[in-house]
Regions:
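Active-site core of metal-dependent hydrolases
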Residues: 1-14, 122-123
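Short, well-ordered turn and helix-capping elements at secondary-structure junctions
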Residues: 6-8, 35, 99-101
Length: 139
């Protein structure tokens, strides 16, 4: 599994991994943010997906697969996360787009309207779900 870091191109003079050639040769790709203090720190997977499409030649469907199920395979946890299937953790985002291909065209815009982790709502349209405070034990 080739894991590509589209955000690094901002730090290395615009060079990119040959993503299209790798896919055309039959390789499976994963996408990652490469968040670290030394090289272009990027937290946004939306930005990574957009860069993969705009600069590396991936289609929106290829980039989304590389960021989700293929990323889970690269991390060795595809049996638990990476796709919506019975028995897997329901980690998902609801994005404000009418067509999935818009994700790659709206660079720099936060499209997230809802976030769920393990089936529980943690973010909804501008508000963060409150976590119950743990009870303090009296000793």
């Amino acid at each position: 599994m080739a894991t590509l870091l589209p955000g690094v191109s901002f730090d290395n003079g615009g060079c990119h991994a040959p993503a299209r050639a790798l896919i055309d040769a039959g390789a499976a790709l994963a996408l990652a943010t490469n968040f670290n203090p030394r090289h272009t720190p990027t937290l946004s997977m939306q930005a990574v997906i957009a860069l993969a499409c705009l600069r590396m030649g991936l289609t929106a469907a290829e980039a989304i697969s590389a960021a989700t199920i293929n990323g889970a395979h690269a991390l060795g946890c595809a049996d638990r996360v990476g796709s919506l299937e019975p028995g897997k953790s329901a980690d998902l985002l609801l994005l404000d787009v009418s067509d999935y291909r818009e994700i790659a065209r709206q660079f720099g815009v936060n499209l997230v309207r809802l976030t769920m982790k393990r089936g529980k709502l943690i973010y909804k349209a501008g508000e963060v779900a409150r976590r119950p405070r743990p009870e303090l034990r009296r000793e």
